[in-house]
Amino acid sequence: MRQMIPVLLLLTLLLPAAAAAQPPVTRAQFVAALWACAGGVPYDANGPFSDVERDSPGATAIAWAYDLGVVQGTGGACFTPDRPVTREEAAMFLRRYAAHLGRDTFLPGGAAACNDFEDISPWADDSLYWATAVGLLEWSE
């Protein structure tokens, strides 16, 4: 649980801001906050995405997260850093990071606790179920 505290801090700081009347949290901001919570280790900012300049905010975090397998692109060698992060993406990023930390991310119960599972993209369903089950995300109606 100790290693999950930075992730809980991340969610406490970022996700309420996204739900309020403030600008939504971008994909780059979310990944940068995750990287900072993980210790903000120095990392080569030269990542694989054509829309993330080496000196842009979040470039180091995005390259770090990509190399760990936490993030992937949005297609066409792009990351789309300025697009708001979706709850599906947030859940996916968090689950992949938890797996990187060696946490159990298996969820045998699946959609039982989810009330809008028919609206979830198939690529994100397990991650959303997991993030909800472990208390990282709340399910909304």
Which residues fall in each region the model found?
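Feature responds to low-complexity, polar/acidic, surface-exposed segments characteristic
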Residues: 18-61, 68-91, 95-125, 133, ...
